[in-house]
Amino acid sequence: MNDIFIGLQLREHFMAEENKKGGFWASLFGRNKKQDEPKIEPIIEEEKIKDIEPSIEKFEANDLVEEEKIQEISTALEPIEEIIEAKNLEDEFQPVVEIETREKPSEGGFFSRLVKGLLKTKQNIGAGFRGFFLGKKIDDELFEELEEQLLIADIGVPTTSKIIKNLTEHASRKELQDAELLYQQLKVEMADILEPVAQPLEIDSTKKPYVILMVGVNGVGKTTTIGKLARKFQAEGKSVMLAAGDTFRAAAVEQLQVWGERNHIPVVAQSTGSDSASVIFDAMQSAAARNIDILIADTAGRLQNKNNLMDELKKIVRVMKKYDETAPHEIMLTLDAGTGQNAISQAKLFNEAVGLTGISLTKLDGTAKGGVIFAIADQFKLPIRYIGVGEKIEDLREFNAKEFIEALFVHEEE
């Protein structure tokens, strides 16, 4: 018995040891199998879900409230925005109250464009003289410097000498105490030169058609000036016809026809190389038959054939007088201000050939040589009808001497 009891104890001991080691006995009795590990799944407690749901609903409710507030604000602002927009439109179309002044017209008008157009010329004369006279005493040296500056501005020797002579006489009579008074007197002297020639063109309605013969060298803006004048007269209620008398340049004829088509103005033209006098004669007949108020005739400007050109212009005038002995009623020379002293020689040449009655000075906005207008006015005493300070139709305006002088001498801050 003792032996059996001891044997059972030994077997249990060995089995216990095998279980620990995972040996044979453990395999035999299935004790070595690993139990399947339970799958770990995310566990969301229902109570936490219940706690979160009210928070989400609260946030969503807050968002809706914010959106409603934004919508209410936007709706409230709409009438204000409409009022502001209406006020802006009202301001935009509100007529500007013009302050009466003898110095210059209202801001934004032709005077404003004239001031801008004369910026380059003002650097040499006019407002550009303010710094020149500042702090200087009146003596011979000052007059010499002034004379040099006037010549640089293309005022020319004869006109410059005349201005200096008059200023010197005022100074010798003790009428000018300082350089500022000399500056003001210079303005007066220059105005005195321009005022006698500021004569606008007056159309005689008893003469139908009233014939304007345009002359000038190629490139001065003659054909463009014709188009602008035609539009101006048309806007005044006058009927206009154009005659393409520059038959040597196809481009000139085409340009005139474009102006005519654009403004519904009839243009009389013939083929390139036709006789200019014949074209203009036909135009006079046509204008009379249609009861046209104003006929503007273009002419050639080939200065390289100076003698031939002058002979042709003389012929045109003779032929025109055969139809109407009072025609042409205006012989207007177009000059480019940028040519400086060359404009003087051109004026002399055309005046001797056909006898000018008026001048249009173009391209004043693109040159520093605008001082030539004083030389032209002083030497020829011919009426200056129009000046051009830009490419727009309204930039060709009747010449006003006082307005021109004010624009020339006005300062940026004034």
From Swiss-Prot:
Gene Ontology MF term list: ATP hydrolysis activity; GTP binding; GTPase activity; signal recognition particle binding
EC number: 3.6.5.4
Function: Involved in targeting and insertion of nascent membrane proteins into the cytoplasmic membrane. Acts as a receptor for the complex formed by the signal recognition particle (SRP) and the ribosome-nascent chain (RNC). Interaction with SRP-RNC leads to the transfer of the RNC complex to the Sec translocase for insertion into the membrane, the hydrolysis of GTP by both Ffh and FtsY, and the dissociation of the SRP-FtsY complex into the individual components.
The protein's name: Signal recognition particle receptor FtsY
InterPro entries cross-referenced by the UniProt entry: AAA+_ATPase (IPR003593), P-loop_NTPase (IPR027417), Signal_recog_particl_SRP54_hlx (IPR013822), SR_rcpt_FtsY (IPR004390), SRP/SRP_N (IPR036225), SRP54_GTPase_dom (IPR000897), SRP54_N_sf (IPR042101)
Membrane topology type: Peripheral membrane protein
Catalysed reactions, semicolon-separated: GTP + H2O = GDP + phosphate + H(+)
Gene giving rise to this polypeptide: ftsY
Organism expressing this protein natively: Haemophilus influenzae (strain ATCC 51907 / DSM 11121 / KW20 / Rd)
